[in-house]
Amino acid sequence: MPRSIKKGPFVDHHLMKKIDEANATGAKKPIKTWSRRSMVLPEMIGKTIAVHNGKQHVPVLVSDNMVGHKLGEFAPTRTYKGHQADKKSK
């Protein structure tokens, strides 16, 4: 179920602090975060946020259609390399 409207969106305080500082200074440097659970807000549009996927930080350029989604949705954690080919059938 989606989050209740009366609760509002959730964003970690340390991430919001970094975004406010980047908006005030106009910095273009990616904002590194481990907070996959934070929701994308309109203040983040145009920023590059490096979201941790468990192994490395994946750069995510935030656009207007991402607002309302979680940051973790844009940094996949699993890599699928395919099933091994069946050598008997040849």
Swiss-Prot record:
This is Small ribosomal subunit protein uS19. The gene is rpsS. PANTHER family: RIBOSOMAL PROTEIN S19P FAMILY MEMBER, SMALL RIBOSOMAL SUBUNIT PROTEIN US19M. SUPFAM superfamilies: Ribosomal protein S19. GO terms for cellular component: cytoplasm; small ribosomal subunit. One of its GO terms (molecular function) is structural constituent of ribosome. The keyword Secreted does not apply. Keywords: Ribonucleoprotein, Ribosomal protein, RNA-binding, rRNA-binding. PROSITE patterns: RIBOSOMAL_S19. It comes from the Bacteria. InterPro entries: Ribosomal_uS19, Ribosomal_uS19_bac-type, Ribosomal_uS19_CS, Ribosomal_uS19_SF. Pfam families: Ribosomal_S19. Belongs to the universal ribosomal protein uS19 family. Protein S19 forms a complex with S13 that binds strongly to the 16S ribosomal RNA. One of its GO terms (biological process) is translation.
